[in-house]
Amino acid sequence: MLMQDSNSFSTVTPQVARFDTPLHLKSGAVLDSYELVYETYGELNAARSNAVLVCHALSGNHHLAGLYDDNPKSAGWWNNMIGPGKSIDTQKFFLIGVNNLGGCHGSTGPASIDVRTGKCYGPNFPVVTVEDWVQTQVRLADYLGIDQFAAVAGGSLGGMQALQWTLDFPERVRHALVIAAAAKLTAQNIAFNDVARQAIITDPDFHGGDYYSHGVIPRRGLRLARMLGHITYLSDDSMAAKFGRELRNGALAFGYDVEFEIESYLRYQGDKFASQFDANTYLLMTKALDYFDPAFPHNNDLSAAFRFARANFLVLSFTTDWRFSPERSRAIVRALLDNELNVSYAEITSSHGHDSFLMEDRHYHRLVRAYMDNVVV
């Protein structure tokens, strides 16, 4: 739980919930037991009506805000959005962040020990879907004694989870914040994910996903996957403004080492990611993205998919997000309106591309604050 005063956070401590009831996954696989790492922020009120679940994106985790005692630079990934007096105010709401099943930040995943073998699951960890994650999040809510969330929120893949909540458990969520998301990936996005996976799988150190027993990690492949992904998260405008065609050493080297500043930046980001993230988890997360398509069981009719949804919605997109473009958000809005649901929508001018949902933008944060201020607890 996160300790806080009236002005700022102090420190946060992750917690672990263990579940021994078998989990039946969409793939048909079964996990006999599993653990979820989570963090909480603020105080749950007496009516237990002020809980907000925040779902993370591909490379995110349970650490939404605040710091860890042993790392003064460990601010959570949505620290600019969550906190006392911030857009999602922890003086009003009780927030929960959870590392999704299959993750690599403490929840059961490929790097965890399979008690049946005494070894890491590795490639034997089952493929998981957004629907599976929502099932585990419901169990966590039950574990915490929360019957209904005031809101479920998330950006990108996190926004997809918020959508799935309104479909699978409409009676358990009053508001959904769907930010920089889509109701399904385009063929182009699936292609990006496959190239990233192939970079990992073809790394000689991948060893069919069992690199743990070889004492190595597929660093080169994971690095390339992150470099590719990072390009798609940025906009051309933001890359031009930040890097342009600047040369690292001021002159052409006429070789194949790093010359341009953008090359240096991408390699740094790739190396950093490869040292912090598990390759098998990356494969799982991208597959969950690929498989998300709530309209598919309804003859590709997204409006029909939302037939039983009850929540109120805030849907936000960003002008330069070409990975999950504003048109993808507008398609969600149209489907919600077809079902006469309450929807607030805004397309926010931003130069930061898909990563805009993580940025501290005054207009964006004011929109979220205005919406959350009207959420009754």
UniProtKB/Swiss-Prot annotation:
Q: Where is the protein found, in the record's own terms?
A: Cytoplasm
The pathway is:
Amino-acid biosynthesis; L-methionine biosynthesis via de novo pathway; O-succinyl-L-homoserine from L-homoserine: step 1/1
Q: Which residues cross the membrane?
A: none
- Which Gene3D superfamilies does the entry mention? 1.10.1740.110, alpha/beta hydrolase (3.40.50.1820)
Q: Where is this site: Important for acyl-CoA specificity?
A: R323
Q: One Pfam family name from the record?
A: Abhydrolase_1
State its Enzyme Commission number(s).
2.3.1.46
Cystine pairs: none
Q: Which family does it belong to?
A: Belongs to the AB hydrolase superfamily. MetX family.
According to its UniProt entry, the function of this protein is described as: Transfers a succinyl group from succinyl-CoA to L-homoserine, forming succinyl-L-homoserine.
**Per its record, how is this protein called by name?**
Homoserine O-succinyltransferase
Species this chain originates from: Nitrosospira multiformis (strain ATCC 25196 / NCIMB 11849 / C 71)
Name the gene for this chain: metXS
